[in-house]
Structure formats: structure tokens, C-alpha cells
């Protein structure tokens, strides 16, 4: 009888955990967005997908490294992260004052972020998925005042990163119900280096880099006024998979229904 009760309790807890996980994601409907750069002009179609409501927090990442010792600060292989990996944590299993439990985890490499998402049966969002979600306004699929919306984002990009970071849910939720896509941390995407791949395939291998950093003067830009997008592309193009950056976090995604 006790064994049956224990099994039932375990099943109930597992179901509750699954419900919490489900509530932690929102469905982004299929749609399109206009990328700042690409070989083909116009909008890019993005299939429906699910995205975490918030960036992954220090508390969530602590649970991950407790369960997966090889991803702890003192044990991670140099191949998968540089020396900045979780450098602001007090100890391997003690985030400390600079990394509050509800603040977004940062100083994690792309390898670590990808592995964390896989451990949750999720994945990192693609760049197109992230940009599709991030293009939404607060009350509508597109901002009511695009210029003011872009200015607000750019103002955040201009602010220096100070630790400890605020808790997730600090900035604003967009039309899809996703928080903190702007205003808290930069975020890893699965194909973060796609801009570099595109640039390398051109006759002028340095052309893309110059476009990314020349902002409104860039040739081939979909929107010369969207400086914030230029900064995101430049950040992605200058980052390597093992880099751990103080203001770079991540959130997870998974395939959705059409």
C-alpha cells in the first residue's frame, strides 16, 4: 500500500512539474519578420514554435550544474567555455550575492546553454525565431510606434551592465507574453554565427562586418534606422561558442504546431 502511495505521489509530482514547465513557455504563431541582412530581400517565414517566457535564471542553472557536474565552473572542459564561465558566482555551487537566484544566468557559453536546453527536452531558439518574437510590440504583433519602440531598446543597449542583475520579468512582456527579450540581457541563439558564415561566403569576406558596425550607413539594410538590430548582429558576429559574456544569457525553445 505504501509503495502504491509513493508511486502515485511521484506521478502527481511529475505531472505538476510538467504543468509548471508548460506554463513557462508560450506559443509563438507562425509568421514572418524582416531580417536586417540576408541574401534574399523581404520577409522570412518562421514556423510556429514555443519559447520560454523568461530567460533562464541563476537558480535554474544551479539545479542544472548540480545534476550535471561536468558543467560546473571548476570542472568544465576549456573546449566548451573560456575562463569567464560563471566567473561572477561565488563558488561552483554557490551563486552568491552577484548572482541572485531569480536573476538571469550570464557568463555561460553557447555550448553550456545548448546543453542546458537539451536537458529540459528543449533547444536554443534560432536567430529567426528569436528575432520574430522580439519584433512584437507590447500590445500588438507589431509596435504601434516603431520609432519609439526602437529608441527604447537602443537606450537599454547604451546602459552599462551592472551586477547583480535585476530579476527576470524586469523589463516588459510583449504581445506574445514573452518577457525580457529587450532590456535585461543579450541572449544566445542556436545559429548565432550565421552572420559570420554568410559573410565568409561573400567575395568580400569583410563586407558583412563593416555593414554590421556602420549602422545606418550600411548597404543592404532592411531598416537603416534600427540601430539596435545592427548591434545584435554585430554582437553575434563577434562571439565564439566558448565565450562567456557578463551580459549574455539565454532562454530555451522547442518546436510548436503550425
Model-assigned labels for residue ranges:
Residues 9-13:
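Hydrophobic helical h-region of N-terminal Sec-dependent signal peptides
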Residues 48-145, 254-258:
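Active-site microenvironments of metalloenzymes and redox enzymes
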Residues 37, 192-200:
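Cytochrome P450 core scaffold surrounding the K-helix E-X-X-R motif
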Residues 1-8:
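Bacterial N-terminal signal peptides that target proteins for export
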Residues 99, 154-182:
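Short, well-ordered junction/capping motifs at the entry into regular secondary structure
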Residues 21-24, 103-104, 108-111, 122, ...:
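Disulfide-stabilized, aromatic/cysteine-rich ligand-recognition loop
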Residues 25-32:
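Mature N-terminal segment immediately following signal peptide/propeptide cleavage
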Residues 16-17:
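N-terminal signal peptide c-region/cleavage motif recognized by signal peptidases
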Amino acid at each position: 500500500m505504501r509503495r502504491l502511495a509513493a508511486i502515485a505521489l511521484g506521478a502527481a509530482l511529475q505531472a505538476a512539474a510538467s504543468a509548471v514547465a508548460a506554463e513557462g513557455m508560450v506559443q509563438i504563431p507562425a509568421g514572418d519578420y524582416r531580417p536586417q541582412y540576408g541574401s534574399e530581400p523581404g520577409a522570412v517565414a518562421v514556423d510556429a514554435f514555443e519559447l520560454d517566457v523568461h530567460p533562464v535564471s541563476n537558480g535554474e542553472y544551479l539545479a542544472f550544474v548540480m545534476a550535471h557536474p561536468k558543467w560546473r565552473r571548476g570542472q568544465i572542459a576549456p573546449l566548451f567555455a573560456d575562463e569567464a564561465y560563471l566567473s561572477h558566482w561565488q563558488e561552483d555551487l554557490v551563486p552568491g550575492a552577484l548572482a541572485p537566484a531569480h536573476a538571469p544566468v550570464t557568463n555561460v557559453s553557447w555550448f553550456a546553454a545548448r546543453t542546458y536546453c537539451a536537458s529540459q527536452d528543449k533547444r536554443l531558439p534560432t536567430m529567426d525565431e528569436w528575432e520574430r518574437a522580439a519584433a512584437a510590440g507590447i500590445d500588438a504583433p507589431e509596435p504601434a510606434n516603431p520609432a519609439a519602440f526602437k529608441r527604447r531598446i537602443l537606450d537599454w543597449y547604451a546602459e552599462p551592465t551592472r551586477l547583480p542583475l535585476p530579476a527576470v520579468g524586469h523589463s516588459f512582456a510583449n504581445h506574445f507574453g514573452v518577457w525580457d527579450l529587450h532590456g535585461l540581457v543579450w541572449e544566445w541563439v542556436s545559429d548565432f554565427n550565421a552572420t559570420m558564415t554568410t559573410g565568409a561566403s561573400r567575395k568580400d569576406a569583410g563586407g558583412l562586418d563593416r555593414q554590421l558596425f556602420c549602422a545606418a550607413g550600411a548597404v543592404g539594410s532592411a531598416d537603416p534606422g534600427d540601430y539596435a538590430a545592427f548591434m545584435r548582429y554585430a554582437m553575434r558576429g563577434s562571439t565564439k561558442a566558448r565565450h562567456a559574456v557578463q551580459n549574455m544569457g539565454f532562454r530555451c525553445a522547442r518546436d510548436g504546431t503550425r
